[in-house]
Amino acid sequence: KACPPQGKISESVDGSGSETGPYAYLEDEPTVGAGKDFTAAQKQKMLEENMKRNGGVVKSDNPNDYYDVLTKPKKSMKGVTPEPNEWQFDHIKPKDQGGTNSYSNCQIVSRKYNREKWNK
């Protein structure tokens, strides 16, 4: 399937749950459900799609992110703070509010943006 132009987000603000993330065109597995994490296979597919539309680099899907180009997360180490521009897979509608692990509910964003979103 072809990538949609830009792949930016159009979020439902009315709480209807009809988010349309930048990967909504990808076909979900039958195991998709509320409160679930994205699988390793889903993450790999979304990274590939993101890089296809961004000339081989991973870029944030959210225009409000602090960073445009994102870096691969390093292995977590005790006492080492991760880089704020590492990519993370964000549930557009949070899991604790019934958000699913559907492709349509995901955006790739920086660690900083995702962490600050948690604190709102």
What are these regions (language model features)?
Residues K1-M51, L70, V80-N85, R111, ...:
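Low-complexity, glycine/serine/proline-rich disordered segments
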Residues K52-V58, S102-C106:
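Short metal-coordination and nucleic-acid-contact micro-motifs, chiefly zinc-binding Cys/His arrays
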Residues V57-D65, S110:
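Short cysteine-rich clusters marking metal-coordination/redox-active sites
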Residues Y66-I108:
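Histidine-centered nuclease catalytic patch
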Residues S102-K120:
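Active-site or metal-binding loop neighborhoods of secreted/extracellular toxin and effector enzymes
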